[in-house]
Amino acid sequence: YDWDSFYQRHTNGNWYARQGCAEKISFTEEGLIPQVEITSCGLNGKPLIAQGEYPAYIACHIFTDKPQMYVAPGFPKIMQENTDGEECLSYISDMYNSATAGFKYFEFKGVKEISVATRGYASGVMELSTEMNGKVVGEIPIGYTNVWVKASCKPDIPDGVHALYITFKGEGTTQLRTVSFN
């Protein structure tokens, strides 16, 4: 049998808006269920291919260096921008210095460039790493803009299955819409 875990996480910085998520459940030989890891893959059953563009709202970890309630004012959060009847644009808002969006897992093969689409009143870099608080493997410069702008870097990520953590370091706050692989 295949077992799955379905859960919700808060969005829009309040207790009422939720995003549905799901993960595969595995069993040990003794029939026990180890803690189910939260990933960006959902029920896909395998890592995401590091090619093309992915929306930032699939980040499975969103955090800062300061402990806070995940619905606290100003805390990074998944937001939507739309009016009734329109397709929804989702992104991570309120990314200030130390804010991190973590994605688990991507299968990297020959990735030469990673791009992010950001907008906001911020100046600094998006640091890339393959481990939480790990070695920086690339930096993407970002600046002040009130429209979505893509910027990129050539990261030092070996082929294989890795997490990707994107951490803003700088002044102000920005929004993260997508991450792209070339």
For each feature predicted by the language model, list its residue ranges.
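Carbohydrate-active catalytic/glycan-binding domains of CAZyme proteins
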Residues: Y1-E139, G143-N182
